[in-house]
């Protein structure tokens, strides 16, 4: 039996009174990610943070600890990631995973970071398994993979073992938390460029600030119409390069015709895998 520390209690109080800064967020995440908080404390902390509003300091503070506990992979300097936040609840096809194959085929190394589904029927790891692609844990194998075929897939649980302390709580509370925002920022290849899909303009703005602080200013953050974390062919899209203003555009403004929304509907892993083929 391991006695649980009450260390997180003071940070729950700080979130509750809206006084949590970047340094305190790091300290709180250190407690959580070392296994020194109870599930009840973690749930209270995450929900209080969600209700009071997450800002860039919370994200940067959490990232600091998460990166220290991450198992990294050496990837080429010009690698990019196409990992979105997910959590849009729309259940579309795995667009960013399909995109990764196309971009890698065009000669740009893709260090793709992803996970199994939490809020949808099929996450990027689920669809890859349905395509008979083995999830590799060994960083040396992954490095070899990206150098040989221009793409590797880094399965989040292999690289972020400390996430085991929050997995159960996240599933039990079932709402979006700061962890949905952290995933795409925690690429084990420490890529400098990424195409990130987010589910709201508010999150898009925070990402812009965070990516500037991290010097990942060759990134593009997109949010689609109807709350999609992808560029949407039919709705209005918002696109942001860190350090600039959000720009709005529709696919029709660049000559792409509107499509039937239903064509993007996803299903289970087998269905999505067949659509990607």
Residue ranges of predicted features:
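Conserved catalytic-core motifs characterized by acidic clusters
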Residues: 81, 115-116, 187, 257
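Glycine-rich anion-binding loops and their surrounding alpha/beta cores
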Residues: 6-10, 19, 68-71, 92, ...
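Short glycine-rich loop/turn motifs that provide flexible caps or phosphate-binding loops at active sites
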Residues: 34, 52, 83-86, 113, ...
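A generic, well-ordered mixed alpha/beta core segment in the N-terminal half of proteins
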Residues: 84, 88-145
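Acidic, glycine/proline-rich low-complexity segments that act as flexible tails and inter-domain linkers
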Residues: 4-92, 106, 110, 258-262, ...
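Alpha-helical scaffolding segments of alpha/beta enzyme cores, especially the outer helices
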Residues: 27, 61, 65, 101, ...
């Amino acid at each position: 039996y391991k006695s649980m520390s009450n260390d997180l209690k003071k940070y729950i109080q700080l979130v509750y009174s809206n006084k949590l800064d970047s340094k305190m967020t790091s300290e709180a995440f250190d407690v959580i990610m070392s296994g020194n908080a109870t599930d009840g404390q973690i749930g209270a902390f995450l929900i209080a943070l969600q209700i009071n509003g997450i800002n860039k300091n919370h994200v940067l503070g959490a990232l600091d600890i998460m990166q220290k506990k991450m198992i990294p992979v050496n990837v080429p300097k010009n690698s990019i990631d196409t990992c979105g936040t997910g959590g849009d609840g729309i259940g579309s096809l795995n667009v960013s995973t399909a995109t990764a194959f196309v971009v890698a085929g065009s000669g740009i190394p893709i260090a793709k970071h992803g996970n199994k589904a939490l809020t949808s029927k099929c996450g990027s790891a689920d669809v890859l398994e349905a395509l008979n692609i083995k999830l590799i844990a060994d960083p040396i194998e992954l490095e070899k993979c990206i150098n040989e075929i221009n793409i590797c897939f880094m399965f989040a649980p292999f690289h972020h073992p400390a996430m085991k302390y929050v997995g159960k709580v996240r599933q039990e509370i079932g709402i979006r938390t700061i962890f949905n925002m952290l995933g795409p920022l925690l690429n084990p290849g420490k890529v400098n460029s990424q195409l990130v899909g987010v589910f709201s303009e508010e999150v898009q703005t925070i990402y812009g600030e965070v990516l500037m602080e991290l010097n990942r200013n060759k990134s593009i953050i997109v949010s689609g119409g109807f709350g999609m974390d992808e560029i949407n062919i039919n709705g209005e899209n918002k696109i942001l390069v860190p350090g600039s203003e959000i720009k709005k555009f529709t696919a029709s403004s660049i000559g792409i015709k509107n499509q039937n929304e239903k064509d993007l509907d996803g299903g289970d892993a087998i269905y999505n895998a067949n659509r990607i083929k």
